[in-house]
Amino acid sequence: MDKLNRLEEHLGYKFKNKTLLKEALTHKSMKSSVNNERLEFLGDAVLDLIVGEYLFFKFKDTDEGNLSKLRAALVNEKSFASISSQIRLGDFLYLSAAEDNNNGRNKPSLVSDALEALMGAIYLESGLEAVKKIFINLLESQYNNIDLQSLGKDYKTTLQEITQARFGVTPRYELVSSSGPDHKKSFEMAVFLNDKELARAIGNSKKEAEQSAAWKVLQGMNI
């Protein structure tokens, strides 16, 4: 259980029920009797409430429309994937060999779902306040400024700002390959800085693949 102990140290939370923790980390590709989809469903609802309450009290003079925009900027796949990187959540997941070989541990959708499942498991074991304490700490560590201006960015924009500030160069994205039928194509995009390839990623659209490639660069800052 050394692997799980390391994750608990990252979280600052000790699970009483290790089976529940393992369930939260088990992807459906494992084809086991349990996976983390039900806990993900629960965690999604819990985090929606926690972030909504957090914003309600933090921004006392902000109207409902802007509060909703702020919550949408924080409660989404990209945000949760970034937060997951703090605790290296992908390293602790139980995946099939095929999913692991397909870079599953670095897929934003997969680690985002696992974060929701993990928070759902903590909620079941210790209640709302425990989840709130852990998640808000992660949230505030990830985002120095929580406001509409700073949260309205995407991975490509963030990467471009960094490379322009450091090198005066804008990243370039190129299509590597595409596959599948017209109604269900997948695209592999590569991101370059000058002539150096920084990362590749696959998505259901070119835009999605570009975002995932930019995310990979930001996680490793492989520049």
From Swiss-Prot:
Its EC number is 3.1.26.3. Mg(2+) binds at E40, D113, E116. Pfam families: dsrm, Ribonucleas_3_3. It is an enzyme of class 3 (hydrolase). The keyword Transit peptide does not apply. CDD domains: DSRM_RNAse_III_family, RIBOc. Residues 154-223 form the DRBM domain. One of its GO terms (biological process) is mRNA processing. Digests double-stranded RNA. Involved in the processing of primary rRNA transcript to yield the immediate precursors to the large and small rRNAs (23S and 16S). Processes some mRNAs, and tRNAs when they are encoded in the rRNA operon. Processes pre-crRNA and tracrRNA of type II CRISPR loci if present in the organism. Homodimer. This is Ribonuclease 3. It comes from Campylobacter fetus subsp. fetus (strain 82-40). The gene is rnc.
